[in-house]
Regions:
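Flavin (primarily FAD) cofactor-binding/catalytic cores of flavoenzymes
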Residues: 2-42, 46-48, 77-217, 221-387
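Redox-cofactor-proximal catalytic regions of oxidoreductases
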Residues: 44-71, 99
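A short acidic, helix-capping loop that chelates divalent metal ions and anchors anionic groups
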Residues: 71-77
Length: 387
């Protein structure tokens, strides 16, 4: 692509975050002749993928998880392993010759007329023609403010620190939280030699098979993503009854709300990668939600007291965007989430984009790839028009 002086802004587009979302936007911008600089606070791309637990694989298929301009190698298999995702991201950055600056953290973003000023590590003040925030859906570990937690002397860690079951061999472990991470860690512990595994559940999740009769759950998510919520709820219930065992006797009754309703509230379905069989076999015991920590014990919602050797809190993450953007009007909602995403900008902040802050049932990487192209197209069009 050839560019004219009008198409070349004085300042680059800054992309904050060197994960898949940020890399995809940078590559899509470069493809359109727009200079993009990726700012990554760690020392390498794909930082979060490097620290995920060992057994993690994509819950989406290889064919539907590639980023713009580079397919995931067929040799990685249908369900790509964590380490292979890292290798793919490294290759992606190399192939597209992306301009990446590591070891730089952005602390604050300010509007400066038609441009943006980023305040970063080492007193840097960087001026960009546009900014894409791609710091990640799972940014900062969230730990509930349980009563008595400060005085608890037992072993407590967030799921972000979990790597494999080896340190928990023979131990009594309580996993708190029944999302995808908590469910998989519980299954991993049960299969990996933990003495006892309990899973504390507050809201019963929707569980789906990764594949049903060879058909990936992701493809179903793509097909139904534009259907009315009530319709998807009914379809989800039919599939649950036909293809999933009744786990009510094991502490996992039918969820109170439908699958799509819960997804709209931010709770994606749990893909089964071992939890169902572990629960049915009694290797994972479902218990009530954690209410407090008291006298060295964990107090559950049903009044039960337990004293596990270790507690792993799979209690989610915060976006942690408030320090970066909380001072700007009309950018974040009351929960600290971006008011828009993809190719849309907040009304009061033209030139500010958000990438990767949704978790759709059609697959996060797939949607990152789609949104990256849309964002790049929008930015390039604005530059060509002299905006």
């Amino acid at each position: 692509m050839t560019t004219t002086s009008r198409q070349t802004p004085l300042h680059p587009v800054y992309v904050i975050g060197g994960g898949p979302g940020g890399l995809a936007v940078a590559a899509s911008l470069r493809e359109r002749g727009v200079r993009a600089v990726v700012l990554e606070k760690s020392d390498a791309v794909g930082a979060s993928w490097r620290t995920h637990y060992d057994r993690l694989r994509l819950h989406t298929t290889r064919r539907l998880s590639g980023l713009p301009g580079l397919r995931i190698p067929r040799s990685f298999g249908r369900w790509v392993a964590r380490a292979d995702v890292v290798r793919y991201l490294e290759k992606y950055a190399e192939k597209h010759k992306l301009e990446i600056v590591t070891g730089v953290e952005v602390f604050r973003i300010d509007r400066a007329g038609a441009e943006w000023v980023l305040h970063a590590t080492g007193g840097r003040r960087l001026t960009g023609s546009a900014v894409v925030v791609a710091t990640g859906y799972n940014h900062t570990p969230r730990l509930p403010e349980w009563p008595g937690l400060d005085a608890y002397k037992g072993g407590l860690s967030h799921a972000r620190e979990y790597r494999n079951p080896k340190p928990y061999a023979g131990k009594d472990v309580l996993v708190v939280g029944a999302g995808n991470t908590g469910a998989e860690i519980a299954a991993d512990l049960a299969e990996g030699g933990a003495g006892r595994v309990r899973l504390a559940v507050r809201t019963v999740p929707h569980i789906v098979r990764r594949t049903t009769l060879g058909w990936p759950a992701q493809r179903s998510g793509i097909l139904v993503r534009r259907l009315p919520t009530a319709v998807v709820d009914r379809l989800g219930e039919v599939i649950r009854r036909c293809f999933l065992p009744d786990l009510s006797a094991h502490g996992l009754p039918r969820p109170e709300k439908g699958l799509a309703t819960r997804q709209r509230e931010g709770a994606v379905p749990v893909q089964d990668v071992g939890l169902i069989e572990a629960v049915r076999a009694g290797k994972v015991e479902v218990v009530a939600a954690v209410e407090a920590f008291e006298d060295g014990e964990v107090l559950l919602a049903d009044g039960t007291r337990i004293a596990p050797d270790a507690v792993i809190a799979a209690t989610g993450y915060r976006r942690a965007l408030e320090p970066l953007l909380g001072h700007l009007d009309g950018v974040l909602d009351g929960n600290g989430r971006p008011v828009v995403h993809g190719a849309r900008c907040p009304r009061e902040a033209p030139g500010l984009y958000f990438q990767g802050f949704t978790n759709p049932i059609s697959g996060m990487l797939r949607e990152l790839a789609i949104d990256a192209e849309k964002i790049a197209r929008r930015i390039a069009r604005g530059i060509s028009r002299g905006r």
